[in-house]
Amino acid sequence: MGMRNIEMSAILTIDFDIIMAPSIELYNNLIGDQKGVNKIIKQFPLLEYTMTADFFIYEAITRELVKLFKRLPAEKVFFISEHHTLLKLVEDLDKFELFNVDHHHDIGYNKTTPTTKILRPECGNWVKYLSDKDRINEYIWICNDNSDMPTTGLHKAYLTEPINIKEFNFDSVRDIQKLIICNSPQWIPANIQALFMSWVGIAEEYYGKDFKIT
């Protein structure tokens, strides 16, 4: 990992779809704004048996979450459904380093270029939206082996560095202002959703309070 200002306030966000590396590319390009993976499964039921998660990544992140809960007070931990709803949670913060553990880079897709204005932030472009508002000091994307890299222009303009999830050191993230854990149900088969709820359950047991998924 390259040089960075470890004193800069940080947002660490984890998208649950990071555990779907073994199968997400089977349906990745079939999911539009209104069509989640479970709608695809309804049309093609046998697909569900091919949609597996990487349980090694799940287990590793679960261990890291327990360590993070020990570092952070409950008021710095949030669970959300859609990744772009993170925007409301960071409105009160100054510029920050953004660490995004995610199968997708969320800088923008299709014909998005550095000059494209994001009029409506959504799950695939919220990082660019924040950066264009001058809210991000550095963007560090923690991805899978088979994650699609952003186009060259977007990479140079927005991404400080991509890091493979298998090489990322969670302890390197200092001064975490908020830990935001995202469900992204449109990317997760229903039979795997229970694993996300286990993260919520661990947080609730540790902090002794209920967490809403907003």
Q: Where are these predicted regions, by residue range?
A:
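Conserved alpha-helical scaffold segments that buttress catalytic/binding sites
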Residues: 2-214
